[in-house]
Structure formats: C-alpha cells, structure tokens
Amino acid sequence: MEQVEILRRFIQRVQAMKSPDHNGEDNFARDFMRLRRLSTKYRTEKIYPTATGEKEENVKKNRYKDILPFDHSRVKLTLKTPSQDSDYINANFIKGVYGPKAYVATQGPLANTVIDFWRMIWEYNVVIIVMACREFEMGRKKCERYWPLYGEDPITFAPFKISCENEQARTDYFIRTLLLEFQNESRRLYQFHYVNWPDHDVPSSFDSILDMISLMRKYQEHEDVPICIHCSAGCGRTGAICAIDYTWNLLKAGKIPEEFNVFNLIQEMRTQRHSAVQTKEQYELVHRAIAQLFEKQLQLYEIHGAQKIADGNEITTGTMVSSIDSEKQDSPPPKPPRTRSCLVEGDAKEEILQPPEPHPVPPILTPSPPSAFPTVTTVWQDSDRYHPKPVLHMASPEQHPADLNRSYDKSADPMGKSESAIEHIDKKLERNLSFEIKKVPLQEGPKSFDGNTLLNRGHAIKIKSASSSVVDRTSKPQELSAGALKVDDVSQNSCADCSAAHSHRAAESSEESQSNSHTPPRPDCLPLDKKGHVTWSLHGPENATPVPDSPDGKSPDNHSQTLKTVSSTPNSTAEEEAHDLTEHHNSSPLLKAPLSFTNPLHSDDSDSDGGSSDGAVTRNKTSISTASATVSPASSAESACTRRVLPMSIARQEVAGTPHSGAEKDADVSEESPPPLPERTPESFVLADMPVRPEWHELPNQEWSEQRESEGLTTSGNEKHDAGGIHTEASADSPPAFSDKKDQITKSPAEVTDIGFGNRCGKPKGPREPPSEWT
C-alpha cells in the first residue's frame, strides 16, 4: 500500500475514534486504559525491573518515587567528577527511526542531581535540550533551574560552567543558546523551553508544539547524538514529544508502515520509559497532531501532481467504522471489574481496573412502556460517572441469557469465586454487562440509594454461637414443620418475601455453580409478577450455604423437614439455624414488588469484613420481626447469655395493620397497649450473672414453661404463630433440653433487640408511666 493511502486511512481512523461508543466514551479512553493496564502489568510482574533506582543511595535522586528508570534502557554515567562518581541518573534511552538511542527521556533535575544532569549532557554530546515544563507549576517546584538567565552572570555547578549567550522568544516557547564549559573545553548547545503546557493536561493548540519540533530538527537533523527531552517526571509530556517527532521522521523518510498505529508506538515506548504519555488527553493530542502532519503531507503530494494516486481509493468514515468493528471481534472481551477490601493510595486504581478490551455489543433493548413499578431501565435516569445506566442486551435463543443476580453476585463476592460453570457458559454476556459499570469508583455510590439498606439488599447474618459447654451433649433430633408462610397483607409483606426468595436463589446459584450443575435459562426481562429485590448472598464461615433444592424452587419436602442434631461445635448451631431459615424463605411465594437494581460496587460492606455483611445490620436501625430465637444459659466464661436472632422478614414498625404474634392474640391485648410483663422470678436474674450448674439443664425449662403459660403460650403440642406463619411441632418423647430447644416465639417488632437475654431482662422495659394493672 502506498504512503498516500496509509495516511488517508490513519486520518479517517482518528476521526472515527472521536465518536463515542454505547457507554458515552470515545475510543481514545478505551485504548489508553489498555496502555495503563499493560504498564501496571510491567510493574507488578517485574517484567522490566527498576532495581537500580530502588537502591537506597539512589532513592533521593528520584523526583517521584513511582517513576523509576527501567534497568535495561537506563542512561549510565561513566564521566566521574570529584563530587559525583555514581553512574545513576533517572533517565532512559528511547529508540528512534535510525538508532536505539535517539532520545534521552529524563526527569527535571533536582538540586542534588544538577551535576549528574550536566555529566550526562557532556558525556553523550547532547546538542538539543527540550524542556516541556515551567520551573514552578501550581505552586510547586517542577524543575531546578540548571541554566542562567539571559543577561546574568554564568553559573557554576562544579566542575561545569554554564552561560546563556542568547534567548529568542517564540509563541509558547523560548530558544536559548547555552555555552557549556568543562576542563578548558566548551560546547554550544540549544535549549527549547516550552512554557504553555499544563501538567497532566494538554495545551489549547498544538500548532506551537509542531512548530517547536520542526525548528528543533533544523538544528539537528541526524540521530547520531541523542536529543535530551525532559519535563517534571520525564514521562507524560516528554513521551508525547518523542512520539510526535518519531512519527514525523518516519513521514519525512516515507517509511510509515501499513499497520502504523499510535497505540503500538506508545506501547513500545512504555517498555523503554515508565508511563510515557501519561494521560488520556495527551494520548489524544498525539493522535490529532500526527493526523495534522499527515494532512499537510497529503497536500504536498497533491501539489506535486500525485492526484492520480488518490483516484478510486477513497475510504469513507462508515467503511472505517466497519473495519474498526471487525478489529474488535478479534480481541478478547473485557474482564469484569474487581473489588478490593482495602484501597491503596497512588496507582492502586491502575491495578484494579480491568482493560476495556474492544468487543461487539449486542443491540440495546428499548425501554418497555411505563408500569406501576420501576424496571431495570428506569432506575437511573442519568448516565454519568456515579450513576451508570444499566443496559440490557439481547441474547440469541440458543444462548443462555445472563443472570443479573448471578453476574453481580459474582462481582461482589469477596472470596473471588469466579471459576464456575456459570462463568464459562455466560462469559460473553456477563462480561458485557460488567463492562458497562467499570467506571464506577470503588466504595462510591449514589447517596440517593442509601436509605434503608436492609430493604434493598439481603445480608448474611453473623451469629455468635454459645459456648460448647452450654450445648446439651445429649440433644436429640427435633422435627420442624416448614409450612408455607402466611401473608395477611400483600402490600406490607411482598417486599420482605421477595427479598427472602431472591436471597435463597442467590445462595442456591452459588452452590449450584460449585457443583457444575446445569444452569436453567433466564429471560432478558423479568416478568412483572416475578420481580423482587436483587440480593447478594455472601457466604462466610459463619453463614452456612443451604443445600441446593429441586429445580422448581421449592423444598423437596415442604411439610416435614427434620433438623440435624445440634452439635457441640459453635458454628454448627449457626449453620442449622441458617438452614432452617432458608427453608422457610424457600417456601414463601413470590409476590409483586419493585425490582431494586443494586450495584455491588456501591455496597457499603461487600468487602469490609471478609465475607460478612452484618455491618449494615447494626448500622441501620430498623424493626426486625423474627420467627426463630434460641435462648441458652451462659457459661462461666461469658458474662451474659447469648441470644441468636435470625431475621426472616423486614417490616417497618409504623405500618398499620401489622399482624401480632400468637401470644398477643391469646392474651386479647389491643394494638395500643403492649402485653403484660411476666412475673419476675429469681432464676431470671441468676441466669445472666451466675455460672451454670449441671442440675440447671432441666430447671430453666420448667421455669420458662411456667412463664410462657402465664402469657397464654403452650410449650408442647401444636402451636400456630400468625405473625411468622410458622407451625412448630414439639416431640412428645423428647426430654426438655433447654440449651438446644428451638422455641418458635415471635416477639413484636418493638421488643426485638440485638443485646443479650440477661441485659434485656435486667430491668423491666415499658412506658415511663405504666398502667395500674401492670403493677
């Protein structure tokens, strides 16, 4: 392919890269993220080591501790001076068109490295020095002044003497003629000082940059000696100037390769100098500057009568876009963003971000007509950095659609369980879905979605187990009838029931992915009658994973589920209670509720406690109606009894018409007045303070039975609690073992707290002026 065609294709490619993609980003940002990803890989995997710059004697010679010269391309100083005999300077060689040492990319000299800087200039016979920063920027010193001002006396950095013979002011830059003297020998060199390039940014116009580079090459056309280019760190602005000059030399020689690509050029430069072209704006500037050079070169070809070369070779922008799409199909899909439990300052974000690899995106589904409940496409109205708009993709019938719950549960999993059958089956669509939220900063989220987090996402409950000495070692199996949960009011309980069902579904999907079971297909849009809260089920050592149920989503035996024998191990008790809770949740019907699309990256505690999400439970004070509680006496090692509470449904206390427990109904107590307090017995105080004696294993049961009978409750036979909808059937032949007795007692929301039993019963609770019949 001839040079004219190559130049035209590049210009059209740059124009196509300016158009935003479906995420609102242009291709410059996508490519630059890939460059940062590669640089992070170089640093973390030590592909290009920087051992010399990390030495203790050289650390003070680095302006920035994270910008160190690569060992394989660093500039070594052999010229010795009385005060400096080290061979280290923070500088690297960058190869040019004709030689491997066309440029010296270095940092702005420090006060203690000015002599090293002049040693390098003298040793390598440098004639051109390009300075792309000011001495001070944003109130900080970016470079030590290593030259004298024009008209002032020469300055000496022993054994070097520098004087300024001339200074010429140009648009945005200066040209100074410096005279360098060393050991009765003098050399004349030229400094091109660009003064209008902001740090980590780009100038408003790059015409003066091209003018400076063009004039620089008039002073030195060859590459026999290197050109020294520096800014403050010697990587961002320095790399941009090197890339433009390198391409310009290729253009002058007519050697622009057919596969010329700025991405590959800068990637190659980054293997020679750390972080060459440091920002996305600088990366775009290089593209635009090179495209302008190519346009001027095309005009020269046309002026010289080369129009016949261009006949019939026009390539439209649409054709260029199609070629870019074909290139996207050859590259791997992007990986989902990973979260980290502890953020690290500095360049840690480079390590966390995944490369936004190009990949074809299926067509976006149009939003459905407005309904009574918000759908996924209407949760966020604005698509910006902190409120990314989720996008649903169309899947072919033969593919398994991506499961929204499973995809985001995988991203929020702190244990990093990503290798499963689900990932291999739905890899393509899941990764597309994750790619669209990659710009969300970690641990940041919209404050408008804070509210009551218990109503938005499910949480695993960490249960403090009782001491092994308290658990009855002769405990026997007990039967629990797990009937369907009875819901009196759909509008009050639909949110909680759907949250429970989806929490079990997320836990079940995690277990099925480990066993490599077949994944049932999931539709792109959930039907309205099946929508519920998306929950994130986190499994840790305290949270037992339920056994996978049958595919229809119900327990194999809904009416007779036998509990396992309570073991003396503390964690086993918690696992069994969590197992019982999950079975009750599983039997609850799915009700109509709004779909809450929660971003796992916005989770306040997704990775803060090593797999436990109980932090949000304690932070958000809400009324929790529990349907299962276990009370056991404390051992001598604990100061208070441990009370296990497993929340089954979440309801606000102020909601009118909340069903009361069976105890309240039997006592014929109205909604306005709380139930009468039971009479206090000495044993209730002894339980919280005194050690356990062996003969008390049966005594507390008898006392507790008497107290419950006074409230209208029975401890044997069949009980029916309307508040939780749980039928408890106590075994008749089982001895009254108090420590492992699972009394299904449902308290009103106002009475449930997270403190121990002894602390709750230490002082009677109630109104400040109780009724007379209470005393």
Swiss-Prot record:
Organism: Mus musculus
Keywords annotated in UniProt: Acetylation, Cell junction, Cell projection, Cytoplasm, Hydrolase, Phosphoprotein, Protein phosphatase
The protein's name in its UniProt record: Tyrosine-protein phosphatase non-receptor type 12
Enzyme active site: 231
Region (Interaction with TGFB1I1) residue spans: 344-437
Residues with PTM Phosphoserine: 19, 331, 434, 448, 467, 550, 567, 596, 603, 606, 608, 613, 673, 748
Signal in keyword set: no
N-acetylmethionine modifications at: 1
